[in-house]
From Swiss-Prot:
The gene is acpS. Keywords: Cytoplasm, Fatty acid biosynthesis, Fatty acid metabolism, Lipid biosynthesis, Lipid metabolism, Magnesium, Metal-binding, Transferase. Mg(2+) binds at D8, E60. Transfers the 4'-phosphopantetheine moiety from coenzyme A to a Ser of acyl-carrier-protein. It is found in: Cytoplasm. GO terms for cellular component: cytosol. It comes from Ehrlichia chaffeensis (strain ATCC CRL-10679 / Arkansas). Pfam families: ACPS (PF01648). It is an enzyme of class 2 (transferase). This is Holo-[acyl-carrier-protein] synthase. PANTHER family: 4'-PHOSPHOPANTETHEINYL TRANSFERASE SUPERFAMILY-RELATED, PHOSPHOPANTETHEINE TRANSFERASE.
Length: 123
């Protein structure tokens, strides 16, 4: 049974500008240590920005699917976006005992990154 659906689109230059303006302070406020570490596999700044833009969109799409938004119960770094062994994007929630499954699709093209999240339980 589908419990929630969320989507978000991010203007990639916005993430680039925030990173240039606030540096690692911005990264640590929004992304987990794992996401920051994973970005280091890209030697090109633009590829790193796309990496972060897709993860930003995924976090926004997730809270839209849950219906809570960000706040006291969940912070952006608690939502960890990574890839499984086959390269499929996935979301894990830090310090959470969620009782539903999460499906994530992310993509980027030129100046935009998009994410789509579906929350569901098995019948």
């Amino acid at each position: 049974m589908i419990l929630g659906i969320g989507t978000d689109i991010v203007y990639v230059p916005r993430i680039s500008n925030l990173w240039k303006k606030f540096g690692t302070k911005f990264l640590k406020r929004v992304f987990s240590e794992k996401e920051i570490e994973d970005s280091k596999k890209y030697t090109n700044f633009d590829a790193q920005v796309r990496h972060f833009a897709k993860r930003f969109a995924a976090k926004e799409a997730y809270v839209k699917a849950v219906g809570t938004g960000f706040g006291k119960s969940i912070k952006m770094p608690d939502i960890i976006v990574s890839n499984n062994l086959h390269g499929k994007p996935q979301i894990t929630i830090n310090n959470s005992n969620i009782k539903y499954k999460i499906e994530l699709s992310i993509s980027d093209e030129k100046d935009y990154a998009i994410a789509f999240v579906v929350l569901y339980t098995e019948l």
